[in-house]
Each structure stands twice: as C-alpha cells, then as structure tokens.
Amino acid sequence: MLLEKALSACFSAQKENRFLYHIPADFPAFEGHFPGNPLLPAVCQMGLCAEAFSRQSGKKQEIAAVSRAKFMRPILPNSTVILAFIPRPDGQYLAELTDEKGQKFSQLICSFKEAL
C-alpha cells in the first residue's frame, strides 16, 4: 500500500496512452536500493505499469502476469519516466518506460487483472 501511494504521488500527466512520472530523489525505494548508488527497483517499475494501467482503465488494476521483462538502463533519482502501453494480439500489453528523448529504461510484456 505504501508503494502504491508513493508511485501514485509521482504521476505528472497523461496524454492519450502515455503517462508521465517524475521519480524524485526522496522516493522511498531509493533508501535501500542501493545505498550510495540508488536506482528504481524492478518491482517499482512494474508498480508504475499497474498504476498507469489503473488510470487508463478507470479501475484499480494489478499485474496478472509478466511474460517478458527487459531492463536496459537504470532509472535514477530525479528521472522523468514516460510509460506507454501498446496492445498485443494475444491480449497482453507491451509496456515501454522511456525518458523524454525516447531512450528505453525498460520494457515489459504483461497482462492485468482488476484488483480485489
């Protein structure tokens, strides 16, 4: 629950299927991951996907499955993350997390389900 609130607080804007997040230096996950060399943990990146998909669908969502995840660059303190969903024919979504220049931080192929 704490993670959900922290991720929701990072939300800045939405343009169509693109969601803008600013990850501040005081984001709670940076304290322990890793001291002296902070980066946003993969679980937080997946949490951003669920948070954004909830905004898109209008209902609270959680990740049902991740069939592939690729982490290309670390998300550091004070980063801006643009998250976009691309629907796939198999019912899953390609979630791409990029910076303002379009350089990828990570991408996940995932499916969602309504949270209980």
Predicted regions and their residues:
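Generic "edge-of-domain/loop-turn" microfeature
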Residues: 8, 26-28, 39, 76, ...
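A broad structural signal for short, well-ordered beta-strand segments within beta-sheet-rich domains
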Residues: 6-11, 63-66, 105
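Hydrophobic beta-strand-centered segment that forms part of the acyl-chain substrate-binding groove
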Residues: 50-89, 103
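Aromatic-residue hotspot detector
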Residues: 11, 71-73, 95
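HotDog/MaoC-like acyl-thioester-processing domains
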Residues: 13-15, 86-116
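Catalytic strand-loop segment that frames the active site of acyl-thioester-processing enzymes
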Residues: 1-40
